[in-house]
Amino acid sequence: MKKRIDYLSNKQNKYSIRRFTVGTTSVIVGATILFGIGNHQAQASEQSNDTTQSSKNNASADSEKNNMIETPQLNTTANDTSDISANTNSANVDSTTKPMSTQTSNTTTTEPASTNETPQPTAIKNQATAAKMQDQTVPQEANSQVDNKTTNDANSIATNSELKNSQTLDLPQSSPQTISNAQGTSKPSVRTRAVRSLAVAEPVVNAADAKGTNVNDKVTASNFKLEKTTFDPNQSGNTFMAANFTVTDKVKSGDYFTAKLPDSLTGNGDVDYSNSNNTMPIADIKSTNGDVVAKATYDILTKTYTFVFTDYVNNKENINGQFSLPLFTDRAKAPKSGTYDANINIADEMFNNKITYNYSSPIAGIDKPNGANISSQIIGVDTASGQNTYKQTVFVNPKQRVLGNTWVYIKGYQDKIEESSGKVSATDTKLRIFEVNDTSKLSDSYYADPNDSNLKEVTDQFKNRIYYEHPNVASIKFGDITKTYVVLVEGHYDNTGKNLKTQVIQENVDPVTNRDYSIFGWNNENVVRYGGGSADGDSAVNPKDPTPGPPVDPEPSPDPEPEPTPDPEPSPDPEPEPSPDPDPDSDSDSDSGSDSDSGSDSDSESDSDSDSDSDSDSDSDSESDSDSESDSDSDSDSDSDSDSDSDSDSDSDSDSDSDSDSDSESDSDSESDSESDSDSDSDSDSDSDSDSDSDSDSDSDSDSDSDSDSDSDSDSDSDSDSDSDSDSDSDSDSDSDSDSDSDSDSDSDSDSDSDSDSDSDSDSDSDSDSDSDSDSDSDSDSDSDSDSDSDSDSDSDSDSDSDSDSDSDSDSDSDSDSDSDSDSDSDSDSDSDSDSDSDSRVTPPNNEQKAPSNPKGEVNHSNKVSKQHKTDALPETGDKSENTNATLFGAMMALLGSLLLFRKRKQDHKEKA
């Protein structure tokens, strides 16, 4: 037990006596003045309140000016519009957002939409910036094969912005420009590319006339190869098969041989030939002189290629040739990711293979409880019959979340209407809507069978909830939903020769709060894959001196198109078994002529094995002639749903090696209303290991006008075990001007069990100059349960140059309910070197509005407080006499004396302890 010291030596003792004396005198003088001449207590002190409130309102107004969340509206500028591309699946995420998002490519623009009073359905704020892949389409030749090349690049969209009016999602309230503007912000969008160009509609081509004999027994296939055996069909992935063939005997015009694909593969991809006798034309096999050696077709139903020889072979022997053909997934027969048999029969010779489909998951959206989630795929495009139709599958709410006021927009374009051939209208579009019983049974390939028992058609329930009020947009009002839906789209495109680009968007709110607006989108587009072959033979005139035919030179597939999307599937570049150059016309060399929205002549030989999940929305209309040879083997799995729109001007050189074990489930709804003009040049080396489980309910309204100049040299080595139960009712109005230059190295282990109920109303006008160099090694065990009712309005302008090295291990279990009424206006210039490890969860003051969370860190302050105080100010009462100042001075002197006495007693109490 420590010995009590009543009197300290020298300075401290004298200082204590002097302060005690001054306090007593102040009480006496203040009481005399107060009771002698202070009789005008009826006069209202509205001036000080106005001043205080004005400063608060000014701060609030400034904060409001800088941090207000502008909820985008329908009338967003056209510059913000950007849509999602078609069979290149590109997810516009908001990101949220991340998208969601802003997408920087052709998916969505990142500029925030201009906002008006009421936000409209699709105008949204940008939350996260993500790069979206821009797929380049390849011009189509007469005999080209098409698949839906899907490239998913999920980009988060703005999702966390609040809706001021939950009805802003209602389509009837939106303007035509709104839908495109919704894309202009950071919507997540995913692109799918179908390998084709709609520049020229293919004529209806019947199967090659096979009037002759099946000569499979006279044809020998060799050097069979698959360009790759693993790919992602939803990311525009496909493979090529290449083979040589030799005719071992004489054949004549009309004779033919065949090749047959297994169930897991198709030769037509996502191109629909059902209106063209289910027959797809294949590029002719030509000789090196350009003569047609064989014509080829592909039967969609039987999955059989037929190669019919022309009269070129009538006088030829030793006919050798090769072919290279693109292969695609069969979405109906291979609906899930996995490995399938891929046994291919060429001229009755079986080549056994395995092929693995790694479908990108169609379950995509904003990663939060009420985040919008949607995806789509173009699964069939009619390019041959002239009917110009396409089929699209849309998964709505595949994450099966509880969503409110849900809208889905199906668009026939992405960024601009004039850049797509898609047509969405009541006459051009047929929609069927199905409710999903078991979401886990949805296919990975986007194939949906209307007769599947897992799907329940509910189209009739949406008859009055489908709108075509905006150009090239179908809007579906789903409302409050908890289930997953499948929308089957049968649409049309025009003959303008432009690529078919579509986009789907979902937006919704939290059904409980009608806030927390979320939006997510998905793009689809089409590109082309080419196939062909070559062959030659010797003349029968000189059988003894045959000219050897060219060995197989498989048709090179298109070079990989640079696509800054996640998991870009390198485009096929198969050249197995190189042979003499086949006729260039027969090779249908599709390495060039990339009809890319980006206008890029990129002769780029890029081996990009990049598994990048980068949600990039790149709107790059860059006309760049880049001859780049890049071997980038980047496995970047960056699912960066970075919703960080942080506008932080912090000149802080913080070397924070913080090993923070902060089990602080910091519910810091820190919609940080920090309109603090703090010039903090803080070099903080904080190695903080803080295990703080703090439940603090501090409702503090502090008006602290403190100007304190404290020069204190305190070396305190205190080991205090304080179990203090203090009930203090103090009302403190402290006007203190504090200039404290304190260098404190405090290694404090404090275990204090204090139960303090402090209702403190203290009016303290203290001018203290304290220069404190305190080395306090205090071991205090404090378990403090403090109920302090403090109302503190603190207008603090702090210029703190703090170099804080805080190595504090604090285990503080504090339950503090502090309602303290302190009026302190503190102008503190504190140069403090503090080592602080704090983990606090603080509830904002009662009289200040809590700002909503914003992904950009913007806070929406309200200036209603200022207006209200101006309106509700108390009328002036009483006489404005000259004695008012004397009364106030007396009261302040009395309170100052009380405060000094109180501090003296508190010091005595500590010394006794």
From Swiss-Prot:
Signal peptide: 1-44
Annotated motif MIDAS-like motif, positions: 272-276
Modification note: Proteolytically cleaved by aureolysin (aur). This cleavage leads to the inactivation of ClfB.
Oxidoreductase is among the record's keywords: no
Skewed-composition ranges (Basic and acidic residues): 869-882
Residues at the site labelled Cleavage: S197, L198, A199, V200
Membrane topology listed for this record: Peptidoglycan-anchor
Subcellular location: Secreted, Cell wall
Ranges for region Disordered: 44-192, 530-885
Induction: Expressed on cells only at early exponential phase with aeration.
Record GO biological process: cell adhesion
GO CC term, one of those recorded: extracellular region
Domain of life: Bacteria
Biased composition (Polar residues): 44-61, 68-95, 120-189, 841-852
Miscellaneous note of the record: Fg-binding activity of ClfB is regulated by the divalent cations Ca(2+) and Mn(2+).
Comment on protein domains: The Asp/Ser-rich domain functions as a stalk to allow the ligand binding domain to be displayed in a functional form on the cell surface.
Family: Belongs to the serine-aspartate repeat-containing protein (SDr) family.
Purpose of the protein: Cell surface-associated protein implicated in virulence by promoting bacterial attachment to both alpha- and beta-chains of human fibrinogen and inducing the formation of bacterial clumps. Partly responsible for mediating bacterial attachment to the highly keratinized squamous epithelial cells from the nasal cavity via an interaction with cytokeratin K10 (K10). Also promotes bacterial attachment to cultured keratinocytes, possibly through an interaction with cytokeratin K10. Binds mouse cytokeratin K10. Activates human platelet aggregation.
Protein name in the entry: Clumping factor B
Organism (species): Staphylococcus aureus (strain Newman)
